[in-house]
């Protein structure tokens, strides 16, 4: 039995749409029949091989897969055939190291990642660890669920990492595929939201989604305006892939403010040591989320409090999608229909 998949055979070259064998689950594995999968910027980096740790071609990218459990391997008891699940970036972790034992499996040094170190979700079928898939709420359809598997859980965890409490101010910098979901999660979590971007249509979207304050990041008085309107932000989540955006967000914080970074631009950021020390500013990175974070992020979406803006496409168009992604021409998220 074969399936259609998008395969990276050589870094920097177009993905190849081909028929490959359907994998069979071994002990402790499940076979997932994918109905849909989101497309993430990480998939583009995987295909280009431009991150310090690279995958090994040939491989199948993708890590926002949603579908049904099609087959159980031996010793699997947590799931049953027909269960609706999502397969995220974190394919598996060791469960034994200090990060794993303290609730930080996303920092496990032995973790495996879907669509990177193991074949991913740009295919009609795939293998998963039953302990690391997310159960989809009954009210959440496959299309809206797919972006939650990476974009959603990433910004949800990032917002938690800002330590902003209900009624306090948080900045969402960059209202793209991640940022538009971050605005919704932040509002659902009871935060006051300031949204910053350089494009008027993105700011209009943020306002439509409930942002309390929208800021043109190019305005020379952007920092002063935020400080005046909010008294300084309690926290900031930077999704923008820009060191300048990170530095600007830092300048908008009040004393004891926390900035969480989820964007991965090249280069470095320059932050003032004096202000960091005297104002007790915290700057931290945040990467995806744990299994518990994923469950919570999916529940928000299942309750209708968060809804990704996405458009459907076909796996055969993946190379054109990557081109549009590189050019910054994608609004919201892309979800591939894997039934076509």
Curated annotation (Swiss-Prot):
Pfam families: ADH_N, ADH_zinc_N. InterPro entries: ADH-like_C, ADH-like_N, ADH_Zn_CS, GroES-like_sf, NAD(P)-bd_dom_sf, PKS_ER. It catalyses: a primary alcohol + NAD(+) = an aldehyde + NADH + H(+); a secondary alcohol + NAD(+) = a ketone + NADH + H(+). It comes from the Bacteria. Its EC number is 1.1.1.1. Its cofactor is Zn(2+). The keyword Cell wall biogenesis/degradation does not apply. Zn(2+) binds at residues 40, 63. PROSITE patterns: ADH_ZINC. Binds 1 zinc ion per subunit. Keywords: Metal-binding, NAD, Oxidoreductase, Plasmid, Zinc. One of its GO terms (molecular function) is zinc ion binding. Belongs to the zinc-containing alcohol dehydrogenase family. This is Alcohol dehydrogenase. It comes from Rhizobium meliloti (strain 1021).
């Amino acid at each position: 039995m074969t399936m259609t998949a998008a395969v990276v055979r050589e870094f920097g070259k177009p993905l190849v749409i081909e028929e490959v064998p359907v994998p069979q689950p071994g002990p402790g594995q499940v076979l997932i029949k994918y109905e849909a999968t989101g497309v993430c910027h990480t998939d583009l980096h995987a295909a280009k091989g431009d991150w310090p740790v690279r995958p090994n071609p040939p491989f199948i990218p993708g890590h926002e897969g949603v579908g049904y459990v099609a087959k159980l391997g031996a010793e699997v008891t947590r799931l049953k055939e027909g269960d609706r699940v999502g397969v995220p970036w974190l394919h598996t972790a060791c469960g034994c190291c200090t990060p794993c034992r303290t609730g930080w499996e996303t920092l496990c040094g032995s973790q495996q990642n879907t669509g990177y170190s193991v074949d991913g979700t740009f295919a009609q079928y795939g293998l998963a660890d039953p302990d690391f898939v997310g159960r989809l709420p009954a009210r959440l359809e496959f299309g809206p669920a797919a972006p939650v598997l990476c974009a959603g859980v990433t910004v949800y965890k990032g917002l938690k990492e800002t330590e902003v409490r209900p009624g306090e101010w948080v900045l969402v910098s960059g209202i793209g595929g991640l940022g538009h979901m971050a605005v919704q999660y932040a509002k659902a979590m009871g935060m006051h939201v300031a949204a910053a971007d350089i494009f008027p249509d993105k700011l209009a979207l943020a306002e439509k989604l409930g942002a309390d304050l929208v800021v043109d990041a190019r305005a020379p008085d952007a920092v002063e305006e935020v400080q005046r309107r909010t008294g300084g932000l309690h926290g900031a989540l930077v999704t923008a892939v820009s060191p300048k955006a990170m530095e600007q967000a830092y300048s908008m914080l009040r004393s004891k403010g926390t900035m969480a970074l989820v964007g991965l631009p090249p280069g470095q950021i320059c932050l003032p040591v004096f202000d960091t020390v005297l104002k007790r500013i915290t700057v931290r990175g945040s990467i995806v989320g744990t299994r518990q974070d994923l469950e919570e992020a999916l529940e928000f979406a299942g309750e209708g409090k968060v809804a990704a803006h996405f458009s459907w496409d076909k796996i055969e168009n993946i190379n054109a999608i990557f081109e549009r992604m590189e050019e910054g021409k994608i609004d919201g998220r892309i979800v591939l229909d894997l039934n076509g």
